[in-house]
């Protein structure tokens, strides 16, 4: 019996006297790793070719998994006594607490219902990414072409959230939506005029002429057969379904649960 008690004490003691500083450092490392893993745009810019060939995963499953992860991080943070941390970690604790509490108050699954404003959003992100993309190798160019080809799924994921928002009566105000539809329509241009083609227009001379021609032709085909049809479908959805079904009021307070949502917006944004 004494041996069992001794073993129990030996097992429980490390957990009972866990170092808050070590727990906090591990939490920060896990949080940063989680954020880095899901930020495929940044990873792509840093040379990760697999990340450079896809868009952020906005599927229901991925967003729900992110919300669960953030809730888990907050639970771990709340188990750490900030007064037990070194003085130089107080600011880090406060910043992380703000970020995680904000994510709990306004989870990604709520924000995903209205993933745009009157001037930008998921629908403009591909063009912004294109303008910030510099291709230096054949492999980078092929990754960008793959990313263009992935646009239908990217738009479909966000459309699914917009449809869910319509079902729940959580939409952006109708007054701003014609301008958003115009932004989408403005992207429906000839492939060679598309902002998505911009990275291919600046391919370096270090890539042989024949290869540059091949890559540009592949990009133009991807824009013609993948990006433009997806943009046309998205525009039609906005005009035919989203705008007619959107709320007429302007204030966030008028949304279901709007008073609490407005309070959280004021507090965390």
PLM regions: where:
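N-terminal maturation segment of proteins
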Residues: 18-269
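Sec-dependent N-terminal signal peptides
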Residues: 3-12
């Amino acid at each position: 019996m004494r041996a069992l008690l001794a073993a129990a004490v030996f097992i429980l003691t490390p957990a009972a006297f866990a170092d808050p500083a070590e727990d906090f450092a591990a939490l920060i490392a896990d949080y940063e790793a989680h954020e880095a893993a899901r930020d495929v745009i940044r990873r792509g810019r840093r040379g990760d070719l697999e990340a450079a060939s896809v868009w952020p995963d906005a599927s229901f499953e991925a967003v729900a998994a992110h919300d669960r992860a953030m809730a888990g991080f907050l639970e771990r943070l709340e188990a750490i006594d900030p007064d037990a941390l070194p003085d130089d970690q107080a600011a880090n604790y406060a910043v992380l607490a703000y970020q995680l509490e904000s994510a709990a108050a306004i989870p990604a699954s709520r924000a995903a219902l209205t993933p745009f404003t009157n001037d930008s959003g998921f629908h403009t992100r591909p063009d912004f990414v294109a303008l910030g993309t510099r291709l230096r190798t054949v492999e980078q160019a092929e990754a960008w072409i793959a990313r263009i080809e992935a646009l239908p799924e990217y738009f479909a994921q966000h459309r699914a959230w917009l449809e869910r928002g319509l079902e729940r009566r959580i939409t952006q105000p109708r007054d701003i939506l014609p301008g958003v539809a115009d932004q989408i329509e403005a992207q429906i241009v000839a492939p060679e005029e598309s902002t998505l083609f911009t990275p291919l227009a600046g391919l370096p001379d270090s890539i042989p002429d024949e290869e540059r021609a091949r890559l540009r032709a592949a990009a133009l085909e991807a824009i013609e057969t993948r990006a433009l049809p997806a943009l046309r479908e998205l525009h039609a959805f906005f005009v035919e379904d989203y705008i007619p079904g959107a709320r007429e009021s302007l204030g966030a307070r008028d949304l279901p649960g709007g008073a609490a949502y407005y309070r959280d917006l004021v507090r965390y944004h």
